[in-house]
Amino acid sequence: MAAIHKIGRRKCAVARVYVSEGTGVITVNKKAFATYFPTATLQYKVLQPMSMTENVTNYDVKVNVYGGGSTGQAEAVRMALARVMCEVGEGNRAILKPEGLLTRDPRMVERKKFGQKKARKRFQFSKR
């Protein structure tokens, strides 16, 4: 099997994932998976598509991810891995689709407006 390449996005983060048959080694930006995503929550998010389709130890994953913060990057990797799992197995799409792992989350940061402190917050109003 040749390496499968997919892209996932979330907020400003973009993840490029290369998956090939192997023993379950995951590297993110040339670092170990547990080093790059130290918290259990982020690790769970990244591994979710592979664990749901029971493919954690069947494939080696190489990830290039940039932009955004740690949560956005983890969810971008999750999106890309879910797309790869759909291509690898026929029945995987039926498993991942109801969980919402194949749907791009459209929520982005709302821009700051002039005449206001932040996107929604106004400057203090003085009646007199």
Swiss-Prot record:
| Biological process terms in GO annotation | translation
ATP-binding listed as a keyword = no
Supply the Pfam families for this chain.
Ribosomal_S9
Q: Which GO terms describe its molecular function?
A: RNA binding; structural constituent of ribosome
Keyword list, A-Z? Ribonucleoprotein, Ribosomal protein
Top-rank taxon: Bacteria
The terms describing its cellular component in GO are: cytosolic small ribosomal subunit
- Similarity comment: family membership: Belongs to the universal ribosomal protein uS9 family.
NCBIfam families documented for this protein: PRK00132.1 (NF001099)
- Please give the name of this protein: Small ribosomal subunit protein uS9
Lineage summary: Bacteria, Pseudomonadati, Bacteroidota, Flavobacteriia, Flavobacteriales
